[in-house]
Amino acid sequence: MSQPEYIRERLDSLAKIDKQLVDVLHRASLTVSSLIDLKKRNEESKPQFQQNAQEFYDDLESATVQLRKEIKLLDENVGTRLLPIQTHKKATGQDNVKLEEQFKLLTKYLGKDQQS
């Protein structure tokens, strides 16, 4: 079963954002590493630290903007392209109950009697 074009686009966009966030973490690691070198009185690493810090902020800004766009698209499409989903924040364990209910219905419709 293929996914609708809209869903595929959203998943591709989220995968791209995920890669950007990995880059942000990598850049943060490089920035901290160059800061440690700088703290050890290695003044030669100052330009490297500045470059890493700038690239960290650039990557973070890009990922944040893309993620906000995806959230906005999600908000705009709830109820039109996507089903409205209402969950209660304190309803943590109800997902297992619902899952078991769905499995029971599925086995009933398939004609299989499953003992739990």
Curated annotation (Swiss-Prot):
Pfam families: Med11
Native organism: Kluyveromyces lactis (strain ATCC 8585 / CBS 2359 / DSM 70799 / NBRC 1267 / NRRL Y-1140 / WM37)
Gene3D superfamilies assigned: 1.10.287.3490
GO terms for MF: transcription coregulator activity
Keyword Coiled coil: yes
UniProt similarity note: Belongs to the Mediator complex subunit 11 family.
Location in the cell: Nucleus
InterPro entries membership: Mediator_Med11
Domain of life: Eukaryota
Quaternary organization: Component of the Mediator complex.
UniProt function note: Component of the Mediator complex, a coactivator involved in the regulated transcription of nearly all RNA polymerase II-dependent genes. Mediator functions as a bridge to convey information from gene-specific regulatory proteins to the basal RNA polymerase II transcription machinery. Mediator is recruited to promoters by direct interactions with regulatory proteins and serves as a scaffold for the assembly of a functional pre-initiation complex with RNA polymerase II and the general transcription factors.
Keywords: Activator, Coiled coil, Nucleus, Transcription, Transcription regulation
Coiled coil: 48-78
An example Gene Ontology CC term for this record: mediator complex
Gene that specifies this protein: MED11
GO process terms (BP): regulation of transcription by RNA polymerase II
Protein name (database record): Mediator of RNA polymerase II transcription subunit 11
